[in-house]
Structure formats: C-alpha cells, structure tokens
C-alpha cells in the first residue's frame, strides 16, 4: 500500500485530472455502475462547553475500478462576527485539518493507498 501525503498529491495529479475523474465517477453513478454513501458525521461533546468533536466519513466506488472511504476528524466551535454566526473547525489547533482517504481495488480487495487529506 502506498502512503501519499499532501505534497505528493499536488505533485502527482492536476486539477484537470481530478475533475475528469470526478466526471467519470458521476457518469458511472448515473449509469448504475457506481455506489456512494453520503457523508455521515458523528458528534461527541468535548470537555470544553463551547466546542465538540466531529468524526465524519463518506465512501463510494465504481465497478471494475476503486472503492474509497474518506475520514475526517474535527473540533467544531461557533464564532460570532457582527450579527453572523459561523461554524469553524480545526484539528489539533486552529488552521490545521486532519483527513485521509483509504483506496482499495474492487477487483481483489487490495488496499492500494492511504492518502492524506488535510
């Protein structure tokens, strides 16, 4: 299994390649040859009364290609600016994020890559 970090991702694929892959996956889904599960978030109170922990996952795959699950780990809090309230998130400290994608072959179940997403 390959371990691919953020620097590797930006070096290995272009935005155009990502867009083409997404278009292909959506076409597979439209044709009934792909599956997906919407993102599911699980929230747990933290010891701080003004923030909570959120774990989120989403997954999908295409026939004859790949299956992927994306996982993320966030601390959530609300910030008021004027009359607006926004939901902010971070992992470990503000400005940092933590997510990863596990990629598998749907032909033999082989784990192919662990991709940093954060």
Regions found by a protein language model. Give the residues of each.
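N-terminal ligand-binding/catalytic initiation module
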Residues: 1-118
């Amino acid at each position: 299994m390959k371990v691919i970090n953020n620097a590797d991702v930006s070096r290995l694929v272009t935005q155009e390649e990502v867009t083409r892959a997404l278009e292909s996956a959506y076409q597979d889904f439209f044709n009934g040859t792909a599956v997906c599960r919407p993102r599911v978030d699980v929230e747990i109170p933290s010891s701080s009364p003004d923030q909570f922990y959120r774990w989120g996952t989403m997954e999908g795959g295409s026939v004859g290609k790949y299956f992927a699950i994306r996982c993320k780990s966030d601390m959530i809090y609300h910030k008021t600016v004027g009359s607006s309230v926004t939901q902010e998130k971070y992992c470990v400290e503000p400005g940092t994020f933590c997510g990863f994608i596990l990629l598998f072959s749907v032909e033999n179940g082989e784990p192919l890559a662990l991709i940093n997403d954060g």
